[in-house]
């Protein structure tokens, strides 16, 4: 996993090129990520940077977290995230900050977030199943899934069968999004297109693995 940044989805807007072409962009506010811990192969079994972002009221931070942040000498953030290190990322110190300038030379990014929760949904919405006949004698099974198995053999429903159930509210990554602009002054990343999650949700931005 490449080094990245934790940010917050602000919303969508559009920007214009010099030719007047409109580009739809998602605005991600990535305030400086503070390094809370540096994990190493010797002590933790793997190399990684643990970072925090944002702020949290002191009264809302439990003792374990407060001690962890105090040891690192960083202000308590709204959470902790890790980025695995491969060895070629350079030297880092606890308490240092990672900013949007990490992406100055990057053109494509992968954005990970938690998708919007949709609650309990049927097969048509959740899995794009085809609907059955609206008329011609069908009076009860318009959005029903149909058969879910075979016969006496195998005599069971296989695990993973697509059915109605809870939809959304899961970790989703959108790959190869174009990074249109880096605004270091306001700690903003402008990414072309949509990214997973609701406005205000935490997102992780990393250089694209397939770029």
From Swiss-Prot:
Gene Ontology MF terms: rRNA binding; structural constituent of ribosome
One cellular component (GO) term of this entry: cytosolic large ribosomal subunit
Keywords from the named record: Methylation, Ribonucleoprotein, Ribosomal protein, RNA-binding, rRNA-binding
PROSITE patterns (alphabetical): RIBOSOMAL_L3 (PS00474)
Gene Ontology BP, a term: translation
Entry-annotated residues carrying N5-methylglutamine: 152
Post-translational modification note: Methylated by PrmB.
Cysteine disulfide partners in this protein: none
Family annotation (InterPro entries): Ribosomal_uL3 (IPR000597), Ribosomal_uL3_bac/org-type (IPR019927), Ribosomal_uL3_CS (IPR019926), Transl_B-barrel_sf (IPR009000)
Annotated spans, Disordered: 135-155
Subunit organization: Part of the 50S ribosomal subunit. Forms a cluster with proteins L14 and L19.
Family classification: Belongs to the universal ribosomal protein uL3 family.
HAMAP family: Ribosomal_uL3_B
Function: One of the primary rRNA binding proteins, it binds directly near the 3'-end of the 23S rRNA, where it nucleates assembly of the 50S subunit.
Record PANTHER family: 50S RIBOSOMAL PROTEIN L3, LARGE RIBOSOMAL SUBUNIT PROTEIN UL3C
Protein name (Swiss-Prot/TrEMBL): Large ribosomal subunit protein uL3
């Amino acid at each position: 996993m490449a080094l990245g940044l934790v940010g917050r989805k602000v919303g969508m807007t559009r920007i214009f090129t010099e030719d007047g072409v409109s580009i739809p962009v998602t605005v991600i506010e990535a305030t400086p990520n503070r390094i809370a811990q540096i994990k190493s192969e010797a002590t933790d079994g793997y190399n990684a940077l643990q970072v925090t972002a944002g702020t949290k009221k002191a009264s809302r931070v439990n003792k374990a977290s407060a001690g962890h942040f105090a040891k690192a000498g960083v202000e308590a953030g709204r959470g902790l995230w890790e980025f695995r290190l491969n060895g070629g990322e350079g030297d880092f110190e606890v308490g240092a900050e990672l900013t949007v300038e990490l992406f100055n030379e990057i053109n494509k990014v992968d954005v990970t977030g938690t998708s919007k929760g949709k609650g309990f949904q049927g097969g048509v919405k959740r899995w794009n199943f085809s609907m059955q006949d609206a008329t011609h004698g069908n009076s009860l099974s318009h959005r029903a899934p149909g058969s879910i198995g075979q016969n006496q053999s195998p005599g069971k429903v296989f695990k993973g069968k697509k059915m109605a159930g809870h939809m959304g509210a899961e970790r989703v990554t959108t790959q190869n999004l174009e990074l249109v602009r880096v605004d270091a002054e306001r700690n903003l990343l402008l990414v072309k297109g949509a990214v997973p999650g609701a406005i205000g949700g935490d997102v992780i931005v990393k250089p694209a693995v397939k770029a």
